[in-house]
UniProtKB/Swiss-Prot annotation:
The gene is TERF1. Residues 403-428 bind DNA. It comes from Homo sapiens (Human). A motif (Nuclear localization signal) lies at residues 337-356. The lineage of its organism: Eukaryota, Metazoa, Chordata, Craniata, Vertebrata. The modification N-acetylalanine is found at A2. This is Telomeric repeat-binding factor 1. Highly expressed and ubiquitous. Isoform Pin2 predominates. Residues 1-36, 266-311, 326-375 are annotated as: Disordered. Residues 23-36 have a biased composition (Acidic residues).
């Protein structure tokens, strides 16, 4: 091959002499060495490219793995924070905040691929409160079995939240069982009440102290039995709120809350004038807060690392049992639009209140908070003589404290159960409850 190349091209020396010269053996050997060196250099370059590519891919894979782990840690922090916010909204009765926080928690949960035991318990708490908030909406569906009512579903989850069955746990469990039947009877669904009773107390070996009592009440179709007055829905809610307060004290030390609290404290300790640069100050304050909480981050990451061995795969049921079937709107009991909707905190309100709350939000300016506007509108509504009359009649018939039943069976001007309670207290102070002659 070298010989063919040499013979085909004129040598430099031949050109200089004005004639072609035959290549010597030394020149031929040198040409072969040059060709070999060039070939080896090309091979070496190709090898370097091939060797360098896997290293870059490995680095990219390591970076991607680090990002994924960091996202999982951050998602865990957000889940704790949203559970904390959900508990506060539930306890304070802020239904709109409850709904928004619930939807945010749903998005976080659907993005998780695995769970620690602590995160799983957090999800159970969110699921439990969501079902309790929809407790009186019998057509709300949380289970694959459409017959299961919201309170039945809450009862099943409640058993998974707390391993130690203390007195509060037992009280809440019994109250949910009773109200799961009472809610059906209040809606006139006595057949469904029997079915709920069978599902809850179907075990023939179970010996519940109030099992026979409930069976007798169902058979008599006594919706307003004194037993239901003693173990009322409001009593159940108060007990659940006691548990929520426990969760709040437990989760108030979560990382995001601690970091946010440090930022707020840092801002409060500074005197910021309108001439200061807000962006620079904010960055500086947040940087200081981050420095203060660096140890908290390290501790949190250590906790995540230690608990990584105890992670469990996020089963489909953990996602679906939360909110996947709760996407049909927020106004379940609208008088003009009776539509099927699943699980919002407003489901325990009556139709009139739900419609009024929706309409009252429309004209509110964006610069004004919605909640104070609602309260101001409600305070301006004077109580009519007819409303006082209906309130006295309702208390006389159903008893003091059963405001939801009174609201359901008597006509009021866009009132809530809380309004009835406050008005009744005012009437007692003014000694207006004895004026029954007009009734």
């Amino acid at each position: 091959m070298a010989e063919d190349v040499s013979s085909a091209a004129p040598s430099p020396r031949g050109c200089a002499d004005g004639r072609d010269a035959d290549p010597t053996e030394e020149q031929m050997a040198e040409t072969e060495r040059n060709d070999e060196e060039q070939f080896e250099c090309q091979e070496l370059l190709e090898c370097q490219v091939q060797v360098g590519a896997p290293e870059e891919e490995e680095e990219e894979e390591e970076d991607a793995g680090l990002v994924a782990e960091a996202e999982a840690v951050a998602a865990g922090w957000m889940l704790d924070f949203l559970c904390l916010s959900l508990c506060r909204a539930f306890r304070d009765g802020r239904s709109e905040d409850f709904r928004r926080t619930r939807n945010s928690a749903e998005a976080i949960i659907h993005g998780l691929s695995s769970l620690t035991a602590c995160q799983l318990r957090t999800i159970y708490i969110c699921q439990f409160l969501t079902r309790i908030a929809a407790g009186k909406t019998l057509d709300a569906q949380f289970e694959n079995d459409e017959r299961i009512t919201p309170l039945e579903s809450a009862l099943m989850i409640w058993g998974s939240i707390e391993k130690e069955h203390d007195k509060l746990h037992e009280e809440i469990q019994n109250l949910i069982k009773i109200q799961a039947i009472a809610v059906c009877m209040e809606n006139g669904n006595f057949k469904e009440a029997e079915e709920v009773f069978e599902r809850i107390f179907g075990d023939p070996n179970s010996h519940m102290p109030f099992k026979s009592k409930l069976l007798m009440i169902i058979s008599q179709k006594d919706t307003f039995h004194s037993f239901f007055q003693h173990f009322s829905y409001n009593h159940m809610m108060e007990k659940i709120k006691s548990y929520v307060n426990y969760v709040l004290s437990e989760k108030s030390s979560t990382f995001l809350m601690k970091a946010a609290a440090k930022v707020v404290e840092s801002k409060r300790t500074r005197t910021i004038t309108s001439q200061d640069k807000p962006s620079g100050n904010d960055v500086e304050m947040e940087t200081e807060a981050n420095l203060d909480t660096r140890k908290s981050v390290s501790d949190k990451q250590s906790a995540v690392t230690e608990s990584s061995e105890g992670t469990v795969s996020l089963l489909r049921s953990h996602k679906n049992l939360f909110l996947s079937k709760l996407q049909h709107g927020t106004q379940q009991q609208d008088l003009n639009k009776k539509e099927r909707r699943v699980g919002t905190p407003q489901s325990t309100k009556k139709k009139k209140e739900s419609r009024r709350a929706t309409e009252s939000r429309i004209p509110v300016s964006k610069s004004q908070p919605v909640t104070p506007e609602k309260h101001r509108a409600r305070k301006r509504q004077a109580w009519l003589w007819e409303e006082d009359k209906n309130l006295r009649s309702g208390v006389r018939k159903y008893g003091e404290g059963n405001w939801s039943k009174i609201l359901l069976h008597y006509k009021f001007n866009n009132r809530t159960s809380v309004m009835l309670k406050d008005r009744w207290r005012t009437m007692k102070k003014l000694k207006l409850i004895s004026s029954d002659s007009e009734d």
